[in-house]
Every structure is written in structure tokens, then in C-alpha cells.
Amino acid sequence: MACNDVDKSSFDDVCCDSGHSSCAAAMEKERESFLSPTENPSTISVSSSMPPDQQGYDVEFDPPLESKYECPICLMGLRSAVQTPCGHRFCDSCIRKSIRDTGQKCPVDNEVLLEEQLFPDNFAKREILSLTVKCSNFGCSEKMELRQLEKHLSQCRFATAPCPQCQESVPISHLDEHKSQHCLQRIMTCPDCAGSFVYAVKQNHEQFCPFANTVCEYCEMELIRDQLALHCDTDCLKAPVACTFSTFGCREKMTRNELAQHMQEFTQMHMRYMAEFLRSQTLNNCTMPSAAAHLSSDDRGASARSPDSCQCKQELLNLRETVLELEGRLVRQDQQIRELCIHNDTQKNQVTELRRKLVSLEESTRELEAQQYQGIYVWRVENFSHHLRNQEAGQPIVLHSPPFYTGRPGYKLCLRLHLQTPSAPRCSNFISLFVHTMQGEFDSQLSWPLQGTIRLAVLDQVEGQHHIEVMETKPDLQAFQRPTVMRNPKGFGYVTFLHLQALRQRGFVKEDVLLVRCEVTPRFDASLRREGVQPRGPEPSI
């Protein structure tokens, strides 16, 4: 049998200390020869940094750990592996603890074993440290040699550490975020009272913080919680209160702002309650002399000096003073109410007059604005998609523009736009556009009927390719006569001005706005013909 054989069987027949010494020395020399110059056992960080009493490697090996690298005591991977003279391998701390606790014998075969007979198995240590293990952190799929595990764990982004505030295990990469945003024991400052508390009691603090904003349940007024009780007891106009005469028998309850009206409406009833109360007090007071007539002189003197009798008289005087005070207050309140009613009527008349003046000023402003257009008016039809949806649903859409003048002085006109429904005869899904004359400020200064050229256009807001139609007025039509009502019911224009399909295909609608332009030139303008634009024959109004 060769002494340098590293298999367990090489130690089965060893029975003397001298044989052990020579064999152990030879094996130690051979094992050291297997280690590279940079892989001396003393330089392996995983084993050298471990406490001497630590058990084996409790890690997940991939592939699973072979039984020859498993400590028979802790059943984990051999840590700081040592060998016994009988050829068994143990963790250094495990076998030493076993010898101290259970006696000087090998736990496997019960052979006599002393601590000084143990020697490091550097060959097994190197093999174990070269095995592949998985990171034990949840969510991490990294694999590495066992010797690299400690370094990886110190850098693993899935590594966890206990929160110093709540002791919850948290990934190290999220620890700062946890301490500042999620930890239930993090310190918070109340924005209302500037007090400090842990987040776990935040809800309780918010419910009882005296400086927190709250809302009165009666009037919905915002105020701090510390003022809420006083507000409800003295100031809140909608808080329920008892009648001032509740001590005299009135059982009515109402809101504080209705108390004055109740006091005014039920004055007689309150006086009746007061009279009944005083009568009962007077009767109770009068029964005392009749009862005193049957008493001896000494008893009558004692009765006269009775504190109850004095107290009743004092209460009666106080009640009479209260009645006089309330009657005076009632008279003053009646006078104030009458004055307030007169003042209120005056203010109502003033408000009505101011509203009338406001309407007149608004009308004058619109009239002045209309006179500034000088016959060229651009009408912004906003929210046009809404009108299109109603048109598609079969609802007739009729829109009128604000009025405008052809000059100063000039004719007052407005535009009328129809979105014809899909079921309309001969003009379905068309835009119809007409011009109407209106009663204006300068009608008496103008010649009638209106004569001239009218140019209508729907503006292309993207490419500038506007849809334009030009028409001449016809003096014999009612549409151009001087209107006898605010707006001439007869219009002049085109029933089929523009198809809605063409409207959608081009840039006529931008930001949900359609622009319609009208240019009116009283008296015929020959320049239109010189520009090559021939008037299109108008169509009768519908």
C-alpha cells in the first residue's frame, strides 16, 4: 500500500501514530503539488474569512454536491475540509465540536480520534471551492464558483438587508427608497401642525391633528379642526340650534340663520310661553304665605328666612327683566327689518336698471363692432364637429352669423348657414349659404333695394385653395328690399354651396373651426370681371 494514495482506503489499515505521521506528511506534500502557485489554501478568501466554528457551505450547488464533498455531521458542503487518520472528511469546526461534545472518536466509524490528529485537506478544499453554485438571493439567476460567491453576494443587486427602522428585509438597491418612501417606521412631519410621527400612525394623526383642515358638516366651510367645535356652537349659520325660549317651553329647532325668522314669526307664542311660566312661578310663590299661616311665630320667622323663598323671588325678578329686554329687542328688530326691506327694494330697482343699461351697452358695442368690417366679414363657425355629428344623426342645423355692415354708413347684413341632412331632397349633405339684410342704423340714409356684388367663400385653412362663389344682387327680389322686421326672412345665396365630402377631404376645418368669408360691394364692381371671375347664378333661398 502506497503512503501517498489519497483515497480513503489508504487509511483503513493505519494503526500506529508513526505510520500516520509519515503518510500524512507525504499526502500533504502531494496535495500541495496539485495547487497552482496562486491558489495556495491560505489565499482562498471564502474559507479564510469564515469563523472557525461555522458549519459547512449551505448553498445550492449546480450540479448537486457529490457525497464525497459532504460533511457527515452537518450534511453540507465541506468548509475548511480536514481529514482524519481513518480517511474521513469533515468540516474543521464540525469535527472539532464533535470531539469536544461527544468524545474523542470518529463520528463515522467510532475510531479513536484526537484533535491534533486532524490535518487540512487542501485538495478537497480546492475542489469544493471550484464547484459551481447559484446565488441564494431571490430573483438572481447568476452562477459562479464557490470561491467567488462571497464577492458576488457583496455586489448582487438582489441582495437583501434589514431596514434599520422597521427590520423588514429589503433589496439593498431599494433600501434608500424603502427608508424614505415605503418604511412604516419612517419619520414624517405633519404639514399642518409641524409635529413628527412615524408613518404607521399617519392615519390616526390625520384624524385627530388639531391644526388639520376640515369641513363643517353643516355649512361645508373649511377651517382647522381646533376651531370646528367653536364654529358650530357660535358661528355656523346652518348648524341646528334650539329656540332662545326653549327654557320657557318652546321645543322648536332650526338652523341658526332661521332663528331670527322663527323669533319674529312666533313672538306671540313665545310671550304666551313666558306668561305661563311666570304664572306658574307666581302661584308657587303665593302658596308659601298660606302655608305659613298655620305655623307658629317661630316657624313663620324661619320660613320667611328660608333660602328657597329668597331664591324664587330673585328668579322672578330676573325673568321680568328678561321679558322687558326681549320686548325691547323685538321692537328694535322689527324696525331694522322694515328698514332692510326698504333698502332691499331700492337695491333691486337699481340692479334692474343696471342690467337694462348693460344690455343696451352690449347691443351698442356689437353694433359698433359690426360697423368696422367695411363690407368684408369672416365668420368663425366654432365647434363644427359637433354640428356635423348632429347633421349625420338627421338633425337640421341652421346657424346665423353676428351682423356686420358694408360700411359706415352701410347696409346691415348677416349670413345663414344650413347643414343639409342626408335625407334632404336635391341638396342632401350640402352646405347651404345665404345672405340676409337686417334693419340697421343707416337704413334711412341708403338707397333701396340693395345693389352690388356679393362674394361668398369657405376658406381652405391649409393650402389656401378657397371655395368661392360670386353673385349679383337682383333688385326685384324681396331679399334686397328694405327690411320691415329685425332680419329679412328672405335670403339670397346657394342651396348647394359646398358638399360635405369635399369639406372633409380638404383643409377647410382646422382646430374644429370653419371660416366663412363674405365680401359685399354695394354698386357693381367691374374689377371682378377684369380678374377673370365670372359671377355664378344664384339659387333661390329655402
Curated annotation (Swiss-Prot):
Substrate binds at P489, K490, G491, F492, G493, Y494, V495, T496. Pathway: Protein modification; protein ubiquitination. PROSITE patterns: MATH, ZF_RING_1, ZF_RING_2, ZF_TRAF. The keyword rRNA-binding does not apply. A zinc finger (TRAF-type) spans 151-203, 204-260. One of its GO terms (biological process) is response to bacterium. The keyword Coiled coil applies. InterPro entries: MATH/TRAF_dom (IPR002083), TNF_rcpt-assoc_TRAF_met (IPR012227), TRAF-like (IPR008974), TRAF1-6_MATH_dom (IPR049342), TRAF6_MATH (IPR037309), TRAF6_RING-HC (IPR027139), Znf_C3HC4_RING-type (IPR018957), Znf_RING (IPR001841). It is found in: Cytoplasm; Cytoplasm, Cell cortex; Nucleus; Lipid droplet. Residues 374-520 form the MATH domain. Keywords: Coiled coil, Cytoplasm, Lipid droplet, Metal-binding, Nucleus, Repeat, Transferase, Ubl conjugation pathway, Zinc, Zinc-finger. Residues 32-54 are annotated as: Disordered. Its EC number is 2.3.2.27. Residues 35-52 have a biased composition (Polar residues). Its main location: cytoplasm. It is an enzyme of class 2 (transferase). A zinc finger (RING-type) spans 71-110. Homotrimer. Homooligomer. E3 ubiquitin ligase that, together with UBE2N and UBE2V1, mediates the synthesis of 'Lys-63'-linked-polyubiquitin chains conjugated to proteins, such as IKBKG, IRAK1, AKT1 and AKT2. Also mediates ubiquitination of free/unanchored polyubiquitin chain that leads to MAP3K7 activation. The coiled coil domain mediates homo- and hetero-oligomerization. The MATH/TRAF domain binds to receptor cytoplasmic domains. This is TNF receptor-associated factor 6. It comes from Danio rerio. The gene is traf6.
